């Protein structure tokens, strides 16, 4: 339970935006266009998301984020 609370506090608003895009199956280029950021910045956010959620890939990150209530 404490881990869940900690994760909620450490995932940024922008990382949640990226997670929502990942949930919809968008590529890094599509996410960059949608959010008005560079593909490199998207990759940076994804790396942070994977680290924070202790996920091995994008799909697992989305599943974990949904389980933790970070995204719907």
Language-model regions, residue ranges each:
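Residues within the DNA-recognition helix of helix-turn-helix
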Residues: 14, 45-48
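Helix-turn-helix DNA-binding segment
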Residues: 2-41
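Basic, Lys/Arg-enriched C-terminal extension of HTH/homeodomain DNA-binding domains
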Residues: 51-72
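Small/flexible residues
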Residues: 11, 42-43, 60, 70
């Amino acid at each position: 339970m404490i881990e869940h609370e900690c994760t909620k506090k450490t995932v940024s608003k922008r990382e949640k935006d990226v997670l929502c895009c990942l949930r919809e199956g968008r590529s890094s280029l599509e996410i960059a266009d949608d959010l008005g950021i560079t593909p490199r910045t998207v990759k940076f956010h994804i790396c942070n998301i994977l680290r924070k959620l202790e996920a091995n890939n994008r799909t697992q990150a989305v599943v974990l984020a949904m389980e933790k209530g970070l995204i719907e």
